[in-house]
Amino acid sequence: MKKFGIIALLCCFATLLFAEVNEEAVALLDKTSNLYKQSTGTEMSLKISIDDAQTGQQTSVNGNLKTRDKRFVLSTSFATMNFDGTNLYIYQPDVNEITISSPAESEISDMDPTQIMSMYSEGYQIPKPEYSTENGKKIAIVSLYPEDKAEDFHRLSLKIDLSNYCPLQITTYGKNGMTNTIDILKIDTNKNFSEKELIFDLKKYPKAQIIDIR
Protein backbone atom coordinates (compact mmCIF):
# COMPACT_ATOMS: atom_id res chain seq x y z
CA MET A 1 0.00 0.00 0.00
CA LYS A 2 2.91 2.34 0.72
CA LYS A 3 4.18 2.32 -2.86
CA PHE A 4 0.71 3.04 -4.24
CA GLY A 5 0.41 5.98 -1.86
CA ILE A 6 3.62 7.41 -3.26
CA ILE A 7 2.45 6.77 -6.84
CA ALA A 8 -0.69 8.72 -6.00
CA LEU A 9 1.49 11.53 -4.66
CA LEU A 10 3.57 11.56 -7.84
CA CYS A 11 0.38 11.80 -9.86
CA CYS A 12 -1.27 14.40 -7.62
CA PHE A 13 1.12 17.21 -6.78
CA ALA A 14 -2.09 19.29 -6.95
CA THR A 15 -2.62 22.17 -9.36
CA LEU A 16 -1.80 25.53 -7.76
CA LEU A 17 -4.75 27.74 -8.67
CA PHE A 18 -5.74 30.46 -6.25
CA ALA A 19 -7.75 33.68 -6.05
CA GLU A 20 -7.69 36.88 -3.97
CA VAL A 21 -3.97 36.42 -3.57
CA ASN A 22 -1.60 38.62 -1.61
CA GLU A 23 0.51 40.71 -4.02
CA GLU A 24 3.70 40.03 -2.09
CA ALA A 25 3.10 36.28 -2.45
CA VAL A 26 2.38 36.62 -6.17
CA ALA A 27 5.65 38.49 -6.68
CA LEU A 28 7.55 35.63 -5.01
CA LEU A 29 5.75 33.01 -7.08
CA ASP A 30 6.39 34.98 -10.27
CA LYS A 31 10.12 34.94 -9.60
CA THR A 32 10.08 31.22 -8.83
CA SER A 33 8.00 30.42 -11.89
CA ASN A 34 10.25 32.43 -14.20
CA LEU A 35 13.19 30.16 -13.36
CA TYR A 36 11.46 27.37 -15.27
CA LYS A 37 9.72 29.38 -17.95
CA GLN A 38 13.09 30.73 -19.10
CA SER A 39 14.98 27.43 -18.76
CA THR A 40 15.84 25.25 -21.77
CA GLY A 41 15.49 22.22 -19.50
CA THR A 42 15.34 21.55 -15.76
CA GLU A 43 16.59 18.64 -13.66
CA MET A 44 15.66 18.13 -10.00
CA SER A 45 16.67 15.71 -7.27
CA LEU A 46 13.65 15.08 -5.04
CA LYS A 47 12.70 13.40 -1.79
CA ILE A 48 9.05 12.39 -1.76
CA SER A 49 7.48 11.67 1.64
CA ILE A 50 4.09 10.61 2.98
CA ASP A 51 3.12 10.98 6.64
CA ASP A 52 -0.12 9.28 7.72
CA ALA A 53 -1.31 10.90 10.95
CA GLN A 54 -3.97 8.23 11.52
CA THR A 55 -1.60 5.25 11.48
CA GLY A 56 1.65 7.02 12.36
CA GLN A 57 3.30 5.49 9.28
CA GLN A 58 5.91 7.43 7.34
CA THR A 59 7.21 6.54 3.87
CA SER A 60 9.76 8.26 1.67
CA VAL A 61 11.61 7.70 -1.58
CA ASN A 62 14.15 9.69 -3.57
CA GLY A 63 13.55 10.60 -7.19
CA ASN A 64 14.93 12.45 -10.20
CA LEU A 65 12.91 14.73 -12.48
CA LYS A 66 13.92 15.87 -15.96
CA THR A 67 11.57 18.32 -17.65
CA ARG A 68 11.44 20.47 -20.77
CA ASP A 69 8.39 22.29 -22.05
CA LYS A 70 5.55 19.79 -21.53
CA ARG A 71 7.76 16.71 -21.45
CA PHE A 72 9.11 15.12 -18.29
CA VAL A 73 10.68 11.96 -16.87
CA LEU A 74 10.20 11.27 -13.16
CA SER A 75 12.23 8.31 -11.88
CA THR A 76 12.19 6.57 -8.50
CA SER A 77 13.31 3.14 -7.30
CA PHE A 78 9.81 1.67 -7.73
CA ALA A 79 8.39 3.51 -10.75
CA THR A 80 9.27 5.67 -13.73
CA MET A 81 6.80 8.17 -15.18
CA ASN A 82 7.43 9.56 -18.65
CA PHE A 83 5.30 12.07 -20.54
CA ASP A 84 6.36 12.71 -24.14
CA GLY A 85 3.91 15.51 -24.87
CA THR A 86 1.06 13.16 -25.79
CA ASN A 87 1.30 9.87 -23.92
CA LEU A 88 2.12 9.07 -20.30
CA TYR A 89 4.09 5.88 -19.56
CA ILE A 90 4.35 4.47 -16.03
CA TYR A 91 6.76 1.56 -15.58
CA GLN A 92 6.76 -0.45 -12.34
CA PRO A 93 9.81 -2.75 -12.27
CA ASP A 94 8.65 -4.91 -9.33
CA VAL A 95 5.71 -6.20 -11.39
CA ASN A 96 7.34 -5.54 -14.79
CA GLU A 97 4.29 -3.59 -15.90
CA ILE A 98 3.88 -0.57 -18.19
CA THR A 99 0.71 1.53 -18.16
CA ILE A 100 0.13 3.86 -21.11
CA SER A 101 -2.46 6.65 -21.07
CA SER A 102 -3.24 9.93 -22.82
CA PRO A 103 -4.00 12.28 -19.92
CA ALA A 104 -5.63 15.68 -20.18
CA GLU A 105 -3.42 18.76 -19.96
CA SER A 106 -4.75 19.54 -16.48
CA GLU A 107 -3.72 16.07 -15.26
CA ILE A 108 -0.17 16.54 -16.56
CA SER A 109 0.06 19.86 -14.75
CA ASP A 110 -0.57 17.93 -11.53
CA MET A 111 2.49 15.74 -12.10
CA ASP A 112 5.28 18.14 -13.07
CA PRO A 113 6.30 20.65 -10.35
CA THR A 114 7.67 23.10 -12.90
CA GLN A 115 4.19 23.29 -14.45
CA ILE A 116 2.45 23.45 -11.08
CA MET A 117 4.45 26.40 -9.83
CA SER A 118 3.40 28.53 -12.80
CA MET A 119 -0.37 28.09 -12.35
CA TYR A 120 -1.56 30.58 -9.77
CA SER A 121 -4.34 32.66 -11.28
CA GLU A 122 -7.54 31.62 -9.49
CA GLY A 123 -9.23 29.15 -7.17
CA TYR A 124 -7.23 29.62 -3.95
CA GLN A 125 -6.97 32.11 -1.11
CA ILE A 126 -3.49 33.00 0.03
CA PRO A 127 -2.33 35.17 2.93
CA LYS A 128 0.84 37.18 3.23
CA PRO A 129 3.97 34.96 3.15
CA GLU A 130 5.74 33.99 6.34
CA TYR A 131 9.49 34.47 6.62
CA SER A 132 12.09 32.54 8.59
CA THR A 133 15.66 31.24 8.52
CA GLU A 134 16.51 27.55 8.08
CA ASN A 135 20.07 26.22 8.03
CA GLY A 136 21.33 29.75 7.49
CA LYS A 137 18.99 30.34 4.54
CA LYS A 138 16.36 33.06 4.50
CA ILE A 139 13.14 31.52 3.25
CA ALA A 140 9.56 32.48 2.48
CA ILE A 141 6.63 30.15 3.10
CA VAL A 142 3.65 30.71 0.81
CA SER A 143 0.44 28.95 1.91
CA LEU A 144 -2.56 28.26 -0.31
CA TYR A 145 -6.09 27.43 0.82
CA PRO A 146 -8.52 25.99 -1.77
CA GLU A 147 -11.83 27.77 -2.23
CA ASP A 148 -13.40 24.58 -3.58
CA LYS A 149 -14.48 22.59 -0.53
CA ALA A 150 -14.50 19.43 -2.66
CA GLU A 151 -10.69 19.45 -2.81
CA ASP A 152 -9.13 16.59 -0.85
CA PHE A 153 -6.60 18.88 0.84
CA HIS A 154 -7.12 21.93 3.02
CA ARG A 155 -3.73 23.59 2.63
CA LEU A 156 -0.70 23.59 0.37
CA SER A 157 2.57 25.31 1.24
CA LEU A 158 5.62 26.20 -0.81
CA LYS A 159 9.01 27.06 0.71
CA ILE A 160 11.15 29.41 -1.38
CA ASP A 161 14.86 30.19 -0.97
CA LEU A 162 15.03 33.99 -0.99
CA SER A 163 18.64 34.04 -2.21
CA ASN A 164 17.71 32.62 -5.62
CA TYR A 165 13.90 32.09 -5.52
CA CYS A 166 14.31 28.34 -6.01
CA PRO A 167 11.61 26.17 -4.41
CA LEU A 168 12.82 24.09 -1.49
CA GLN A 169 9.69 22.18 -0.55
CA ILE A 170 6.07 21.62 -1.59
CA THR A 171 3.74 20.21 1.09
CA THR A 172 0.11 19.17 0.73
CA TYR A 173 -2.00 18.74 3.87
CA GLY A 174 -4.82 16.29 3.17
CA LYS A 175 -8.20 16.28 4.85
CA ASN A 176 -7.69 12.57 5.54
CA GLY A 177 -4.66 13.22 7.74
CA MET A 178 -2.11 12.49 5.03
CA THR A 179 0.73 14.99 4.63
CA ASN A 180 2.57 14.72 1.30
CA THR A 181 5.92 16.48 1.02
CA ILE A 182 8.23 17.04 -1.95
CA ASP A 183 11.69 18.17 -0.84
CA ILE A 184 13.63 19.63 -3.77
CA LEU A 185 17.22 18.74 -2.93
CA LYS A 186 18.94 20.06 -6.04
CA ILE A 187 17.95 22.04 -9.14
CA ASP A 188 19.84 22.45 -12.40
CA THR A 189 18.34 24.77 -15.03
CA ASN A 190 19.20 25.35 -18.69
CA LYS A 191 19.96 21.67 -19.24
CA ASN A 192 20.17 20.46 -22.83
CA PHE A 193 18.38 17.11 -22.82
CA SER A 194 18.51 14.93 -25.90
CA GLU A 195 15.28 13.60 -27.42
CA LYS A 196 16.32 10.12 -26.30
CA GLU A 197 16.39 11.20 -22.65
CA LEU A 198 12.78 12.40 -22.74
CA ILE A 199 11.12 9.63 -24.78
CA PHE A 200 10.04 6.30 -23.30
CA ASP A 201 11.58 3.37 -25.20
CA LEU A 202 9.29 0.33 -25.09
CA LYS A 203 12.02 -1.79 -26.70
CA LYS A 204 13.98 -1.65 -23.43
CA TYR A 205 11.27 -3.74 -21.74
CA PRO A 206 10.45 -6.59 -24.17
CA LYS A 207 8.97 -8.84 -21.46
CA ALA A 208 6.92 -6.20 -19.66
CA GLN A 209 3.15 -6.47 -19.49
CA ILE A 210 1.60 -3.49 -21.27
CA ILE A 211 -1.70 -1.99 -20.14
CA ASP A 212 -2.82 0.51 -22.77
CA ILE A 213 -5.76 2.67 -21.67
CA ARG A 214 -5.41 5.42 -24.26
Give the role of each language-model region.
Residues 48, 76, 92-93, 171-174:
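Beta-turn initiation residues at beta-strand->coil junctions
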Residues 16-57, 68-71, 204-214:
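N-terminal leader/targeting segments and the immediate start of mature chains
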Residues 62-111, 180-181:
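An acidic-aromatic
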Residues 4-13:
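Sec-dependent N-terminal signal peptides
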Residues 54, 94-96, 176:
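Solvent-exposed strand-loop boundary residues in beta-sheet-rich modules
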Residues 127-206, 211-213:
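Gly/Pro-enriched, hydrophobic low-complexity segments
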Residues 87-145:
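Surface-exposed, polar helix/loop patches in the mature regions of secreted/periplasmic/lumenal proteins
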